[in-house]
Amino acid sequence: MKSMDDRTVGLISASSSRASLKIQPEIGYPRICDYCQPIIELMTASEFARHIRQDHTTKEGGSFLCRYGEHGVCQKLPLEGVCDLDFEAHIRRCHTSSQPAGYSSPTSSLVASYTEDSEETASLRSIRLTSDRDTPTIEKKKFTLHSFTQNLSAVLADPSRSRSDLTTFFTRHWGDSFVPTQPVPQSKRLARLADSAFDSYCQSAGESYRRYQAIKRALRLSHADGGVGIGDERQDAEDLPTIFIDPRFTLGDSSTFSDVFTVPANDDLDALKQTLSGRNVIPATPLEIATNRKPGEFRDYEALQNRLEMMHDVVDGRLAGKLVAKTDDFWQVVRSYSGLQEQLANALQCVMVVRKNLKRVDELVCDQSKKIVEVHERYEQKKKLLAKLHDISCLREAQSTVQMMLSQGDYPKAIECIETSLDVLSKELNGVTCFRHLASQLRELYTVIGRMMNEDFASLIQKELGVKPEAGTMIQAEGELSAVLLGLMRMRKYSFIAVLREEIIEGVKSVMRQVIKNQILNNGVDLNDFDPSLTQLGEPVRRMKHADFLKTVKAVMDEEFYFCKRLEALQDILLETVERANPLHRHGSEDIIVERIEEAKDIHESESDDEVGTTFSKSASSGGFSVGGSALSSNASATTLLSIEVRSEAFLRHVLPLIAEFGHQCAQQRISRLLIARAKNASVTEATTPTQLSECIKLVKEFQSKCDKEGWYSTQNQKVGGLGRSVNKLSMDYIEKFHAARKIRIGNMLDTELWKATDVSIVDQNIVDMAMETGQLRNTKRIDDGPIKKSFKRTESAVTIDSTTSTSNQIQGVIVDEENYVVVGSSITMIQLLSDYCEAISEMPSFSQDWNSRVVELLKTFNSRCCQLILGAGALQLVGLKTISVRNLALAGRSLELVCRFIPMVHDEMDRVLPENRKSLLRYFKQVESEYRDHVNEIAAKLISVIAHYTTNCLGMWDVKGVIPSPEFQQICRHMLKFHNGLVGIMPRDQIEALFRQVHENFKANLREHVTGMGITPHDPLKYGYVTKDYMFYQQNVKNMESCRNLELESLNDIMFE
C-alpha cells in the first residue's frame, strides 16, 4: 500500500512538474509499463524514469540493480550493480530513450544525461533511493520462483560482511570440488535405447555431413585462390598514396606539385602518406626523417628520389606479377582470335551460296506462285460477278415464283423465297436501281401470306375439331396443317395459339352438347315443355333418372377423353413442326417465360373462382377427394399459360406440350358444370342416395385416372383441378343437406314424442338383426313385402306416483341379442338415421372426417334433447304431459340404452374408413357413449329419488301405535308396488331388482334414523315389537313383487345394529 501511495505521489509530482515546465509531447510517449499490473500509463521520460526508480530498482550494498525486465532481471546492466550516477545513465540509455540502446554508448549516454535540462535532471535525482528500507523491492510483488534470486556480485561485495565470510562463501556449504559425489540414477520413465536405434539416422546424417564437408572444403579453396588477388587488389589500390592513383594527377598543377615536392605544414597532412587503407607501403626513410626542413621548403632530393624509386619498384613488381598471372589467359585469347577469323571466312562463303540459291528460288517458285494467286483472284472476282448476275436473274422471277408456290399451297417455300430475296436485296444487290421497288412489293406480299395462313389455319382447325374423324385416324388434313404451321413458324407469327385455344374451348362445348342431346333423345325425356332446339340443356338433365344421368356422364367423359387424344395428336404435329422450323434453337429465355406467366396469373385465378367457387377449401380440410396425378411442375396451370399471348419461340416451346392438357382442363370445367346443373334442383339432391353419389364419384375418379396415365396433370393435380373441386363441392353440399334433413327429422320427432312405447315394424327389427349378425349397421330390407308391423299392445297407463290404476301388461319391443328393448318411436328413428349414416360412410369413405363430425353432432343432439324433455321436464310444455311419470323415465332410459348399444358399431364403421393420421377423431364416439351412460344413470337416480322422497315423507309421519300394520307402512308399500308396476314391461328384471335394492338401502337408512330418533330400542319390547311387525309387513309386500323375489331383506335387528 505504501509503494502504491509513493507511486501516486510520484506521478502527481511528475505531472505537476511537467505542467509547470510546459513540456511538449515527447516521441514515443505516453507509454505503458510492460511489467506492472494493473496497467500504468506514463506520459514523459522523467515520469517513466521515476517509475523505474520506485518499482523496478533494488539496492544491495552500495550498488543499484535494475529489475525492469523479464523475471525481474534487466539484461543490459551488470549483475554486480552500478553506482547512482551510472544507474541514471543506464535508465536514460536503455529504457527511457526512444532511440534503440544499440546506437548509443555509455559515455555518450552519460554526456547526454549531463546535458539534459537541469530541472528534469533534478527531478530524476530527487527520487534516488537512500536506504534499503525505502527501496521498493521486487519481493513486495507477486511471489514467484525467481523471488529467491540474488545478485552474487553484490553479495560478495557487501561491505557489511567480514573477509572470512567472503573467502569461505562457496566452500563452506558446497565443498572444494563443487562436484556432486553421488551420480544421478537413470530415470525409470525413459526407455533404454540401443546403438542400433541410431543407425538409420547416422547413415543419413553422415551422408549429409560428408557432402557438407566437401562443399565447405571447396569453398575454402576457392576463397584461398581468390583471396590473394582480392587482397592484392585492395593493397594495390589502398596502400599507395592517393595522389598518385588519382586519374587527374598532373605535375602541371601547382597544388599537386606543391604536395609532392614541398614539405607540408602538418605531418598528418602529407600527401605522400595519405592512403585509402591508412597504411603506407613505402614509409619515410631515415634520411628523410633526419632532415629537418621547414614547411613550404622543397623536400630532400635524395630522400624523395629514393622514396619514389621504391614506390616505382613496388608498383613495377606488382604489375609484373599481374602480367605473369594473366599470361595464360592472354595467349589463349590470341590463339582463339586466329580460329575465329577462319570461322568468319567460312561463314561468309556459306552466306554467299545461300543468297545465290534464294535468288534462284525467287525466280523459279515465288514469281510463279504470285502469278497463280493473281489468276485465282481474277477468277474469284468473275465468279462473284456471275453469282450476282444469277441473283439478278432470279430476282426478276421472284414474284412469279412466289405466286406459283402459293398456288401449290407450299407456304414454307414461298416464305423462304421472299426472305431470301429480301436478304439478297439488302446485302448483295443493295443500291441496284432496277430493284428499288421490289423490296416493298415483297414485304407487302409477305404480309398477305401471313394473313392467308392465319385464315387457313383457323379453317383447318375448325374442320378438324368440329367433325369426328374416321375410325383409325386422329388428324385428317395433317399435310395441309403441317404446311400452314411451318409457314407460320417461319414468319414467327404465333397468334395461331390464341385461335387454337378458342377452337379447343368451342370443340369441348360442342362435343358435350352433342352427347347430351343424343342421350336426352335416346332416354325419351318429355320435351313438350322445352325448346326443341335444346339450346338450354340444364332442365332436361335435371329431369333425367339417376341411371340415365350416369350414362350421360359416362358418355360425355368418353367423348371428351377421345377429343383430348385428338388434341394430343395435334400437339405432336405442332412440336414436330417447331423442330423442323428451327432445329438449332432449343433454348429460350426463361426470364421472359416467367414474366409472361406472372402477367396472367391473376386473370386465370379470378376466372376459375367464378366458374367453380370456393367450396373446395372446406373439403380440403377433411381430405375429401383423392389426390393423385403428377406433381406440379409449374406455378401456373395449362389454362393460364395458354391464355398468355405468345411473342417468342421460347415461350411457344413452353406452351405447345400443354395443348392436350389444356383441352383436358376445359373438359373438366364442362363436366363440372354438368354435375352442378343437376345438383341445382333441391328435389334431385334430396332423392339422391349416398350410393348414387358414390357411383358418380367413382366415374369421376376413373376419368381422372385415365387422364393421369396420359400425363394431363403435369401442371395441376386432381384435387386442385376444376373437376375435383366440383365433386368436392357437390359432395360437401350433399353431406350438409343430408345431415340437416336428418337433424331436423329427429328434432321434430323428439318435440312431438308422447313418451309412450311404440310398435316396432319388421323392417326395423331386420335392421337390428342384420346389424347384430354382420356387425355393420345398414338400412336395408330382408324381405320384399311391404311394411308389416308386429301387433304389439300399447299400454295407456301414464303411471305416476299419484295414479290410482296400475297395470302389469308386458309390451314387446326391439330385440337386441335376446334382450327386449321397449322404447319410444324417436329411438327407432334414431337407429334408422344411424344406419343411413353408416351406409353413407361406407359409400363415401373419402369424406369420413366430415361424416364423423356430423354423426357425433346428431348423437349429441339426441342425447341432449332427451335430457331436456325428460329430466328437464320440457315435454310438459311441448306435448302437454301432465307429469313426468316413472314409465316415461323408464322409456327414456331404455331408449338411450338402445341407441348407446349401436354407437360402437358406428365407431367401428368410422374406424374402417378413417386414415391413420385421423384416428384421433374416434375419441368423440367414446365421449358420446360416456355421455349416454351418464344420462341413463341420471334417469335411474331420478327414479330412486322419486320413491325415496315418498318413503321419507311417510316415515316422517309415522307414529308407533297399536295399529298393525300402521297406515304409513301401508302407504309405503302401495307406492313401491306402483313404482314396480310402472317399470315392469319396460326395464328388464335385473335392472328393476337393482333399482329396488338401492331403494331398500335408502329405506333402511331412513328407518334406522327415525327409530333411533323416536328412542325405540329392544329394551322397550312393546314399541319395538310394533316396529318389528311394520317392518315384517314391508318385507312381505316387497317379496310379493315379481322382480324382487330374489332380493335379500335383513331383519330389523340387523338394520338397527348394522
From Swiss-Prot:
This protein's source sits in the domain of life called: Eukaryota
Q: Which UniProt keywords apply?
A: Coiled coil, Golgi apparatus, Protein transport, Transport
Q: Describe the inactivation phenotype.
A: Mutants are viable but display reduced brood size and enlarged lysosomes.
One Gene Ontology term from the biological process aspect of the record = protein transport
Question: GO molecular function: any one?
Answer: syntaxin binding
Cellular component annotations (GO), alphabetically ordered:
cytosol; GARP complex
- A Pfam family that the UniProt record links to this protein: Vps54_N
Coiled coil: which residue ranges? 369-389
Q: From the Swiss-Prot or TrEMBL record, state where the protein is found.
A: Golgi apparatus, trans-Golgi network
The task this protein performs is described as:
Acts as a component of the GARP complex that is involved in retrograde transport from early and late endosomes to the trans-Golgi network (TGN). The GARP complex facilitates tethering as well as SNARE complex assembly at the Golgi.
Subunit structure, per the record? Component of the Golgi-associated retrograde protein (GARP) complex, also called VFT (VPS fifty-three) complex, composed of vps-51, vps-52, vps-53 and vps-54. Within the complex interacts with vps-52 and vps-53.
Can you tell me which family this protein belongs to? Belongs to the VPS54 family.
Q: Which PANTHER family match?
A: VACUOLAR PROTEIN SORTING 54, VACUOLAR PROTEIN SORTING-ASSOCIATED PROTEIN 54
> What is the protein name for this chain?
Vacuolar protein sorting-associated protein 54
**Species per Swiss-Prot/TrEMBL record:** Caenorhabditis elegans
